[in-house]
Amino acid sequence: IYNQNYYFFMVFSLLLKNGISISKAFDLAIIGLENKFLIFQYKKLFSFIDSGLELSQAFKKIDIFDSLVFSMLSVAMKSGRLEVLSEEIAKYYQQKSENLMDKFLVFLEPMMTLFVALLVLFLALGIFLPMWELSSGINF
């Protein structure tokens, strides 16, 4: 979800920087999303914005975003710098995505080490067990 939010806000920011209206930029940014749940939520958000609700209030109504996003959007609407702060929100979600991936990899590393150790043990036993059985059959 973090990666999809990153994508949405980055595209949204780039479109706004190039002079596209908020409603058109919102609509175009939704097109690139792959997560069906997020597409549905963003379309619902778009309908709230079309009905005249302020952007930060519409995001609060959806309730899938962090409180930091609400406050950044509120500041963006008051300052008129939505394109800049939406890029900052994109960077925030990119950082959250990278942190989640790092946590997953920290968990995965010992599991992979254990898997390789078991594989080496299996191969070593496959080689040495027949040799030990051969030597036990020979009498001196």
Model-identified regions with their sequence ranges:
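Bilayer-spanning, highly hydrophobic alpha-helical transmembrane segments
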Residues: 95-140
